[in-house]
């Protein structure tokens, strides 16, 4: 199954099928998104692909090809065209919108823009164009960038007459396969000897993987963590030195060489090409293009005679922009708005895939909504100040208590004047660009849904999202995750009849359609941010246990667990198993928060075997199981109230704490939680602490009591010191 999944997830068009594959087990039917069903009064109609003139209509006529009337029609059409070139009385006759010619080209799809080739530099080597086409089309690297370093003086360490190409691989496996295939192609086609730094040979990779698996088994058996997570296999960066190729030398004027130049060797005729292959994360991390561009700028300042490199423009999202239509008011509602593409150089395309994510982390989610129209850059100061005030309004709302925040949101989406917050929000919204206004409106609806405001519904949020998509506004990753959190928001109600313990199927359908649209817009949905959210959404939101359907009405709540039908319980398990298979097959990297969520789900469902398997996978992933993990573990068992599970956990996990690297020792917070588990597993611990109990439990109990007493003594000392200094009144 892993091989099939890996083969199917290589393109964005197939990824949404992987996410939706688990829905068949639950019976939820997902229909394709009907984006075009949005009314024109609420959203802009989609951009048409092209015009349909009258000369094309005759090609679909029912007459035969050899009909002589066709020639007559053609002659009459030509004569009519010639007559139409002169002004006539009926020249202002109304022309329907569907017969009007569209002169502007349709913008490229965002995925197509990632595969565009960069422009060739001046006097390129003959092999350069073929090299770029092979890198983009055959091995599938995206977001290609080309830097011409032939003007550097002195030349870089890689050699003189250097041209450097940058490309992004989809994964670490794709990176290694692409580099190996590229080197073999150069050897067989051009008889070159490329040097790939960072590429492991096929046999060497197998040996390292076997050694890593052997170490992982030993670590899991010992109950510890891997000391060196970076094993040198997944570097995420391969530098391929193609070598020196013919042609491409820049013509230097005579007398450029400085007087008194001393050196040896011969001047090499040709151009050296280096290809930097990286994963998207590594490319964002090191930002090698910016470093070389700074070197070029410094070189141009030191050598005034050399051409200056083109300055990198600030990153922007290339998308559709809306212009005012020139048609009459009668058919304005029928005319599709013209959407010319923004022409961007290749450096801007590189910034789209990397710099935007980097700026997003620094500025936060409030500034993720970057305008697409180039005219927005020349807005007035009043409009710019409104963009800065909108995030401040959301910050004000987030600092309020939930009840007060709900009151500030008014009656619902149609309410715009009942509170001062709504009045200020819509006043600022009217002065912003349409792209930002649409995104901020979605943010407001998400806030209302997450606060469980009755006036903000998920159906209205998804309708506003469709209008946002139809208008071709940018869809940042942070906005997608925010929308997904709102659609998957759910509060269980065990007291209802029947109990509401899982997310309704209608809400799950909306969330999956959102993920599908995000995948078609180029978002990587095979990521922990998406998969874990879906995993939690299909799971139960409280502690449950399975019973037969005929015994469901008579079953009682036992041990804080609510009875559910075994058929529904097994359906949830099948969905979770499919999602876990997708995570393993796609090699999705999980973090501490994701593992804690998975552990809680398995504990709520009473799947203790899966719980301890996931606990061991944390160590195999190279994540340190520190204080937060053991606080979660002992708190979970204390809330569960099962003395047998608490006793087993104490005997197994307390020695494991001391074997962690670094070890986890008791402090007051951890000691308090462990004491609760000991009191649950051994109720008479105070009376029989010296009799008939394992030595480990007695030792741990004394450690916990000592840590708690020390904490109380320290707090008492601090209070006395503050009282003496006069900072606190004496009681």
Curated annotation (Swiss-Prot):
Residues 68-93 are annotated as: Disordered. GO terms for cellular component: mitochondrial inner membrane. It is found in: Mitochondrion inner membrane. It comes from the Eukaryota. It is a peripheral membrane protein. Residues 1-29 form a transit peptide. One of its GO terms (biological process) is mitochondrial gene expression. Gene3D superfamilies: Beta Polymerase, domain 2. Probable mitochondrial mRNA stabilization factor. Belongs to the ATP25 family. This is ATPase synthesis protein 25, mitochondrial.
């Amino acid at each position: 199954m892993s091989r099939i999944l890996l083969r199917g997830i290589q393109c964005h068009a197939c990824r949404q099928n992987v996410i939706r594959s688990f829905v068949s087990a639950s019976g939820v039917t997902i229909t394709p998104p009907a984006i075009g069903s949005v009314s024109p009064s609420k959203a802009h109609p989609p951009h048409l692909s092209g015009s349909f003139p009258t000369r094309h209509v005759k090609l679909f006529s029912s007459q035969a090809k050899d009909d002589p009337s066709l020639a007559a029609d053609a002659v009459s059409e030509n004569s009519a065209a010639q007559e139409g070139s002169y002004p006539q009385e009926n020249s202002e006759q109304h022309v329907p919108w569907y017969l009007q010619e569209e002169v502007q080209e349709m913008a490229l799809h965002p995925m197509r823009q990632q595969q565009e080739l960069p422009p060739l530099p001046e006097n390129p080597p003959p092999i350069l164009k073929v090299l770029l086409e092979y890198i983009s089309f055959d091995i599938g690297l995206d977001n290609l960038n080309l830097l011409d370093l032939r003007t550097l003086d002195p030349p870089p360490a890689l050699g003189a007459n250097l041209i450097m190409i940058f490309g992004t691989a989809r994964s670490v496996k794709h990176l290694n396969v692409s580099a190996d295939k590229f080197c073999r192609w150069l050897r067989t086609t051009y008889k070159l000897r490329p040097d790939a730094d960072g590429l492991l040979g096929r046999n060497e990779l197998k040996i390292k993987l076997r050694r890593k698996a052997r170490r992982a088994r030993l670590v899991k058996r010992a109950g510890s963590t891997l000391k060196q997570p970076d094993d040198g296999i997944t570097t995420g960066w391969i530098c391929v030195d193609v070598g020196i190729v013919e042609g491409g030398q820049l013509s230097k004027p005579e007398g450029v060489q400085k007087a008194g130049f001393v050196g040896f060797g011969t001047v090499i005729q040709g151009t050296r090409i280096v290809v930097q292959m990286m994963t998207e994360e590594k490319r964002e991390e090191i930002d090698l293009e910016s470093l070389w561009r700074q070197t070029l700028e410094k070189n141009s300042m030191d050598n005034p005679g050399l051409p200056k490199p083109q300055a990198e423009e600030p990153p922007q999202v290339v998308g559709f922009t809306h212009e005012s239509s020139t048609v009459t008011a009668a058919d304005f509602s029928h005319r599709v708005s013209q959407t010319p593409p923004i022409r961007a150089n290749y450096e801007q395309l590189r910034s789209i895939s990397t710099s935007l994510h980097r700026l997003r982390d620094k500025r936060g989610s409030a500034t993720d909504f970057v305008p697409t129209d180039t005219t927005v850059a020349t807005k007035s100061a009043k409009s710019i100040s409104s963009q800065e005030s909108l995030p401040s309004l959301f910050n004000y709302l987030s600092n309020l208590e939930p009840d007060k925040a709900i009151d500030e949101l008014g009656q619902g989406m149609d309410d715009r004047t009942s509170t001062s917050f709504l009045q200020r929000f819509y006043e600022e919204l009217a002065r912003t660009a349409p792209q930002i206004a649409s995104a901020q409106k979605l943010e407001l609806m998400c806030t209302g849904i997450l606060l469980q405001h009755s006036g903000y519904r998920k159906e209205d949020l998804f309708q506003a999202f469709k209008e946002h998509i139809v208008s071709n506004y940018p869809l940042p990753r942070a906005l997608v995750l925010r929308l997904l959190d709102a659609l998957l928001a759910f509060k269980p109600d065990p007291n209802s009849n029947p109990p509401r313990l899982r997310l309704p199927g209608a809400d799950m359908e909306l969330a999956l359609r959102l993920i599908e649209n995000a995948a078609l817009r180029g978002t990587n949905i095979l990521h922990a941010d998406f998969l874990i959210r879906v995993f939690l959404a299909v799971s139960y939101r409280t502690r449950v246990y399975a019973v037969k359907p005929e015994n469901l009405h008579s079953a009682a709540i036992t041990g804080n667990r609510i009875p559910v039908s075994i058929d529904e319980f097994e359906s949830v398990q099948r969905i979770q198993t499919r999602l876990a298979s997708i995570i393993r097959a796609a090699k999705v990297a999980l973090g501490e928060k994701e593992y804690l969520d998975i552990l809680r789900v398995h504990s709520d469902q009473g799947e203790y075997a899966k719980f301890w398997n996931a606990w061991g996978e944390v160590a195999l992933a190279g994540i340190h199981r520190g204080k937060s993990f053991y606080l979660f573990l002992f708190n979970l068992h204390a809330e569960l109230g099962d003395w047998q599970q608490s006793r087993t956990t104490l005997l197994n996990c307390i020695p494991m704490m001391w074997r962690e690297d670094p070890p986890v020792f008791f402090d007051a917070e951890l000691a308090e939680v462990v004491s609760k588990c000991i009191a649950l597993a051994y109720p008479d611990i105070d009376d029989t602490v010296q009799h008939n109990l394992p030595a480990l439990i007695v030792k741990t109990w004394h450690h916990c009591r000592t840590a708690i007493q020390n904490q109380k003594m320290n707090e008492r000392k601090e209070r006395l010191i503050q009282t003496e200094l006069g900072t606190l009144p004496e009681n």
